[in-house]
Structure formats: structure tokens, C-alpha cells
A protein has these predicted regions:
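Enriched for short, Lys/Arg-rich terminal
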Residues: 1, 20-24, 28, 65-104
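Arg/Lys-rich, positively charged N-terminal/basic patches that mediate binding to nucleic acids
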Residues: 1-40
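Short non-domain terminal segments
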Residues: 9, 16, 44, 60, ...
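Intrinsically disordered/low-complexity terminal segments and short unstructured peptides
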Residues: 13, 47-49, 88, 99
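N-terminal functional modules and adjacent low-complexity/disordered segments of proteins
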Residues: 36, 52, 91-94
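A short, surface-exposed loop/turn module that caps and links secondary-structure elements
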Residues: 39-71
Length: 104
């Protein structure tokens, strides 16, 4: 069962602030890891990599049961996605730190 995963230019723009925060080698590793995770999402509909802690978000504005996140790069980079199970579609939302993730 394959999933359709959409990662727009707006999604990738949320990765750019990490370029200033990390050395180039680490920044490129973050991008590479996100791309690998997208491939896994296409194949499985979830990320099963040990230590990435793929889970449903419970706080507003992501608390409707369809938003998920996984943690990469020493748990400091949070990747958020929206999953529509019935249509087997995943939309990548954004990449945040613990300080920058939107909350109400």
C-alpha cells in the first residue's frame, strides 16, 4: 500500500532557518534525513525509524487527530505532517524546533 506524499516549496522553506543554526554538514544531513523519511512515508504511511518518535500531535493548532510529527537530529528538529488515511495522502506541513512549533 503506497501513500501520496506532498512536500511543497512552503514546506521546504521552513527548513531554511536551520541553515543558520547548524553547520553546513549538519544542515545537509537534516535535509537528507527528511528526504529519507518522505520515502518511508510513501511506502508505509508512517516513520518507523527507531528514535524518531513518530506520533500524533495533541496540542492546538494540530489537535484534530490528523497531524503527526517525528523528531530528528538529536530530538531538536520536529517534522510535522498531515495524514488523510481514507485517501492515503500525506501533506508535509513544516519543520520546527521546540521553540518555533506553532501553538495556541
Amino acid at each position: 500500500m503506497s501513500w501520496t506524499v506532498r512536500a511543497s516549496a512552503d514546506f521546504w522553506a521552513t527548513v531554511r532557518p536551520f541553515k543558520d543554526k547548524y553547520p553546513e554538514r549538519e544542515y545537509l544531513a537534516i535535509i537528507r534525513t527528511i528526504r529519507e523519511a518522505i520515502v518511508e512515508l510513501e511506502e508505509k504511511g508512517f516513520v518507523s525509524e527507531t528514535g524518531w518518535d513518530d506520533h500524533r500531535l495533541m496540542k492546538k493548532p494540530f489537535d484534530d487527530g490528523n497531524y503527526f510529527e517525528f523528531h530528528i537530529h538529536d530530538d531538536d528538529v520536529l517534522v510535522v505532517y498531515f495524514k488523510r488515511v481514507r485517501r492515503q495522502t500525506i501533506r508535509m506541513i513544516g519543520v520546527f524546533s521546540h521553540l518555533t512549533i506553532p501553538s495556541e
